[in-house]
Amino acid sequence: MTFEYTTSAVSQPHSILFVGGLGDGPATTSYLADVVKGLQPTQWSLFTLALTSSYQSWGLGHLDRDTDEVAQCVRYIQDYKTSKYGAAGKIVLMGHSSGSQCVLHYLSRPNPHTSKPSFDADLEHVERPVLDGAIMQAPVSDREALLWVLKTGFGDKSPQDMRVVYDNMLAAANEAVKGGSELDAILPLSLTACIYGYNTPLSARRFLSLASPDSPQSPSEDDLFSSDLGPAQLQQTFGRIRPVGLLRNKLMALISGADQSMPDWVDKEGQLVKWKSATNGAGGPEIWDSEHSAVIPGASHALSDDDQEEPRRFLVGKVLGYLQTLQ
């Protein structure tokens, strides 16, 4: 299911498809109102979509299914714009938070996907269309966010309390997957609610993918943005964008300067430098957008607080500048 934000005042043949983070879905990311307003006089309209993993279903999801569904939505938008304007126009995929993992997974994995997950046996992989552009906003590490909670505590729970919860979740998850069951096992809500809330079922498989206990040497599928990932690990993700060939132009990234989901030990500017190096590789034209990628000064994770007007203005300016390079 997808929704378009558009205007009848101007022709808008080009499209941005927006994917939110864990727990998000259509109408949950408040700064999109600023983006839509900024797009009104342009040739771009914005689409949001509901994935199988949207809202409280993220704990049962996985990136292959997410990006297959994104690909189907891209095809739908292209057909819709063709019927309306006579051509598909350009399309940009923009991810917020863990939605940025969808962007990188879409661009870096085999096309179509080759996995055959027993826990999602009905999944049929599709060929993913080439994108004209891609934007990652607030790309954060779920693993490091967990480590930050273990260091600082969460709510009324001390760091020591959270360490006990985490260790128990890790032990339960490892035990659940040890037998190689073809089905997902749901972790006890009494444990997961301490971190993720009472309304979110979380499978052992997805928790291990997010927590990625074998990182940084052997990161899981969901561990794409941790600050301790080295060149060899980044080469398998950012470094695969060029050879996979699903991006016609450049990749842009915006990190929130005051992102409460990022630990204080993370060098945000350093992250952009590492990702740029891995994306561009050793040869060929640059496919990392150095001009528009940035750390947004003072921005919180979702730019949703009352004091975020200036960070939202900065974000919209960067997005509009990036889109102008594609026309």
Pin down the residues of each PLM region:
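Primarily recognizes the serine-hydrolase "nucleophile elbow" in alpha/beta-hydrolase
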Residues: 79-178, 208-211, 215-218, 222-226
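Alpha/beta-hydrolase active-site loop
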Residues: 31, 59-85, 105-108
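A short acidic, helix-capping loop that chelates divalent metal ions and anchors anionic groups
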Residues: 54-59, 302-305
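Short, surface-exposed "cap/lid" segments of acyl-processing enzymes
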Residues: 2-56, 76, 264-265
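Serine-hydrolase catalytic core
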Residues: 9-10, 150, 156-327
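Alpha/beta-hydrolase
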Residues: 18-19, 137, 296
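Residue-level signal for short, function-critical loop segments
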Residues: 21-22, 97, 140, 257-259
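Short N-terminal helix/helix-N-cap motif within the alpha/beta-hydrolase-1
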Residues: 26-30, 111, 304
